[in-house]
Amino acid sequence: MTAQSKNYRKAASAIDRDRLYAPLEAVRLAKAGASTKFDSTVEVAFRLGVDPRKADQMVRGTVNLPHGTGKTARVLVFAVGERAEQARAAGADEVGGDELIEKVAGGYVDFDAAVATPDLMGKVGRLGRVLGPRGLMPNPRTGTVTMDVAKAVEEIKGGKIDFRVDKHANLHVVVGKASFDETALVENYASVLDEVLRLKPSSSKGRYIVKATLSTTMGPGIPLDASKTRNLTGEDAA
């Protein structure tokens, strides 16, 4: 048995599959079972009671994690002229117009988020085959199609992330790193949960959050009690 599988089995043995854990409890279990070889990413996964095939039940949005993701995002900006200079000044990793569009069309995707000015979306829109499946296509709804490219870059670098339910009604969102303290992870999770709840489609009937699970990279899933939305870090939170 490999060391990795031993660590997984040990972490999994500490989880009671017949109960739902309060967020603080789940975070403690996740941190305790995280790999010591690298700083694991901590992620929450929701199974939603929606039908993503219906346009009015597509859950998509953005959230500003109060403690960031633990990773400095690489941001690419499609802009020219003054807006391009503003993007560079704000810390964008790559900025450009036609040449950058051609580079991405050729398969270049070494970035975590893309921003575009509205005037270039006619050309950027043709990159759907490359950007769409990776969730990287700029979109007005997530604030990534904008003339204020500097603000968009700063927000993404500061911990703003976007999320979108997949075709199986699953939603995966990063809430930080295992090295974060408990409070930071719980507060990041709370921000994600609040936004997911706010985005509940009016046409979605019945149970909205069917299942919620917290996990680390290569770690076991920990069943979450998503009904807990208040006092998540207080003395009686666990």
Curated annotation (Swiss-Prot):
Classification via InterPro entries: Ribosom_uL1_bac-type, Ribosomal_uL1, Ribosomal_uL1-like, Ribosomal_uL1/biogenesis, Ribosomal_uL1_3-a/b-sand, Ribosomal_uL1_CS
GO biological process, one term: translation
Record has Ribonucleoprotein as a keyword: yes
One Pfam family matching this protein: Ribosomal_L1
UniProt keyword annotations, A-Z: Repressor, Ribonucleoprotein, Ribosomal protein, RNA-binding, rRNA-binding, Translation regulation, tRNA-binding
GO molecular function per UniProt: rRNA binding; structural constituent of ribosome; tRNA binding
NCBIfam families, sorted: rplA_bact (TIGR01169)
HAMAP family, per the entry: Ribosomal_uL1_B
Function: Binds directly to 23S rRNA. The L1 stalk is quite mobile in the ribosome, and is involved in E site tRNA release. Protein L1 is also a translational repressor protein, it controls the translation of the L11 operon by binding to its mRNA.
Oligomeric form and interacting partners: Part of the 50S ribosomal subunit.
Family recorded in the similarity comment: Belongs to the universal ribosomal protein uL1 family.
Protein name as annotated: Large ribosomal subunit protein uL1
Taxonomic lineage of the native organism: Bacteria, Bacillati, Actinomycetota, Actinomycetes, Micrococcales
